[in-house]
Amino acid sequence: MKKIILVSVLLLISLAATIPVLAAGPPKPGEKLFDFTLPVPAERADRNYLGISGWGKTFRVADIKANLVLIEILSMYCPFCQKEAPIVNQLYEAIEKDPAAKGKIKIIGIGAGNSAYEVEVFRKRYNVPFPVFPDPDYDIHKKCGEVRTPFFIAVRLNPDGTQEVGYAKLGGFGEIPAFLEMLKKSAGL
């Protein structure tokens, strides 16, 4: 009888541990962004771009000085991410050249399963001008539902401190001018 109770308790505990994993899915428009922290970039240019101070070891997306943050979940080993890198760089340039978007829409990358060394190699190889953060243990990747890469999430940073997902999609985003207009609209610009 004690064995049956022990096995039942262990089964319930293991089932309870899997429920949050099963419930996690990709973010959807209209939802609040899942909570996570990122390391403060060592490079001053990256800190300046994000509008965060060099103080502290970590920051949250809500700390970024912007109306909207486009997050790219990527992997340096993903051939689709490699193919998409020049297009995302062109989007970055289009944002920086657009007076309405510059400083109000920011891009960051998160390297799912990638170390700091690996994301730096990716940045150098593909001339990525925006910060890319390591996620070596897939912590952030798991929180966003273990999406395939590249996966893009546009997050509106509201004045009241809330964050709302406005766009979440696997793969490329199509034509840059149309996508930038959609981002500007989501950002309230």
List each model region and its residues.
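Short pre-active-site segment immediately N-terminal to redox-active cysteine/selenocysteine motifs
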Residues: 67-69, 74-77, 148
